[in-house]
Design a protein with these regions (language model features):
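Alpha4 helix (beta4-alpha4-beta5 surface) of REC/receiver domains from two-component response regulators
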Residues: 80, 103-118
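Conserved phosphotransfer microenvironments
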Residues: 52, 68-85, 92
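Short hydrophobic/Thr-rich beta-strand motif most characteristic of the beta2 strand and flanking loop
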Residues: 43-51, 58
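Non-catalytic signal-transmission and effector/linker regions of two-component phosphorelay proteins
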Residues: 1-22, 26, 150-154, 389-396
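Conserved acidic segment of CheY-like receiver
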Residues: 17-30, 34-38, 67, 157, ...
């Protein structure tokens, strides 16, 4: 008996122009052309995104039958997006078409192993769009492919049917004893059951079968965090990042853990992997800047915070961090200038107003600071820090 029959896996939605499609492509013109052409073909194009990370968030919230994604999406590129869709228990993946440059044979094989259902090679011929999507969907729903069985197992996890999920993953393991992926699934089931030792055992089985399985190392790190094994968790995070150095979400998860444990220098080392790999994301520069600020290395902190702000000039959080850094470095005039720039955009931002008042106090401009603190309280009457600071400088 095949696994589809054994577990009563529902039949897939038949292919038609009514299927929902998400387009994720960094080039605006190509993204809009694809969206327009797909709509003309009758498909429901419910979102178009230029960021892989945003595309993933959209797909977690509103799954698509088919995803068309570019290989050069910022932060989370096409293959990384697919891997996240395959591995994340909260995600329901559909057919996946990768927009890519011409690939060497080994590159194409790696993409197929990652789960790509079909390719469209740049420059894209729109006449190929319908045949490629049709082929990709047929490949995804092919009963000889285990993908829908893995998706069924994930659906059991999402509905807290842990025994059902475990049974499917065990059957997948029996059908392919050399496969690493079922053991990651079994580790997730054990982790939800708070069986951390069993989860670690299963994820180690996965690593033994495939040492380059990035999500096995990432899950191992998550398990070790729960076991409060900080050093081992850091090593597992580092391994996952070295295998997949261009996935920004891996750095976000790792940095949250390291900084929570006050591992500042370890955080810098991890983030520098991204810089060396050429990852262009303001998160990397901002977090390195934060780490150097924590180490009181203000020149380096300013360098990276400025870099983050150049990449994302609309991010007033980055600007506020830079202003605080300048303040602590003794560059008070520059700090005030940065706060003024923020307040031109967000004139009622009372935390920024408060921070500006602190700098003015350091400049012995207490009357001006007092006016700003009173303005803070007008905006936020329960802002206790502003009340206390007014008392400290003797203004009622």
């Amino acid at each position: 008996m095949d696994l589809f029959t054994q577990f009563g896996i529902p039949e897939p939605t038949p292919f038609s122009g009514a299927l929902k499609v998400l387009v994720a492509e960094s080039h605006n013109e190509i993204r809009l052309i694809l969206s327009h052409h797909l709509t003309k073909l009758g498909f429901v194009v419910h979102r178009t995104e230029r960021s892989g990370k945003v595309a993933l968030a959209e797909l977690l919230n509103d799954p698509a039958h088919i995803t068309v994604a570019g290989d050069d999406l910022p932060g989370v590129a096409g293959l990384e997006l697919l891997r996240e869709l395959r591995e994340n228990p909260k995600a329901q993946r559909g057919a996946f078409v990768l927009l890519t440059k011409a690939l060497q044979k080994n590159e194409a094989m790696l993409a197929i192993e990652a789960g790509v259902d079909d390719f469209m090679v740049r420059p894209i011929a729109l006449t190929d769009l319908m045949p490629k999507i049709r082929t990709a969907y047929a490949n995804f729903v092919n009963p000889k492919s285990p993908e829908r069985v893995y998706e069924f197992a994930k659906s059991k996890l999402r509905t807290d049917d842990l025994n059902g999920a475990k049974a499917v993953y065990e059957a997948l393991s029996l059908s392919n004893p050399k496969a690493a992926r079922p053991h990651v699934g079994l580790a997730r089931v054990a982790l939800v059951n708070n069986q951390v030792d069993a989860a670690l055992k299963q994820v180690n089985f996965a690593v033994e079968r495939n040492a380059m399985y990035v999500h096995a190392h990432a899950l191992k790190a998550e398990i070790l965090v729960k076991m409060n094994k900080v050093t081992e968790a850091t090593e597992a995070f580092s391994t996952a990042i070295k295998i997949s150095p261009l996935n920004i979400m891996r750095y976000e998860q790792c940095c949250e853990f390291l900084l929570k444990n006050k591992l500042i220098n370890e955080t810098i080392s991890i983030l520098e992997i991204g810089l060396t790999a050429g990852l262009q994301d303001p998160f990397i520069a901002e977090r390195i800047g934060y780490c150097y600020f924590e180490n009181k290395d203000y020149p380096k902190a300013q360098k990276y915070l400025r870099q983050a702000l150049r990449t994302d000039p609309e991010n007033m959080g980055f600007a506020n961090s830079l202003a605080i850094c300048c303040r602590d470095a003794g560059l008070l005039d520059e700090s005030v200038e940065i706060y003024n720039t923020i307040l031109k955009r967000e004139n009622d931002n009372h935390p920024v107003l408060f921070n500006k008042a602190l700098v003015l106090i350091l400049q012995n401009k207490k009357d001006e600071a007092g006016k700003i603190l009173k303005r803070c309280l007008k905006i936020a009457p329960e802002f206790e820090k502003a009340k206390a600071k007014l008392g400290e400088i003797g203004i009622s």
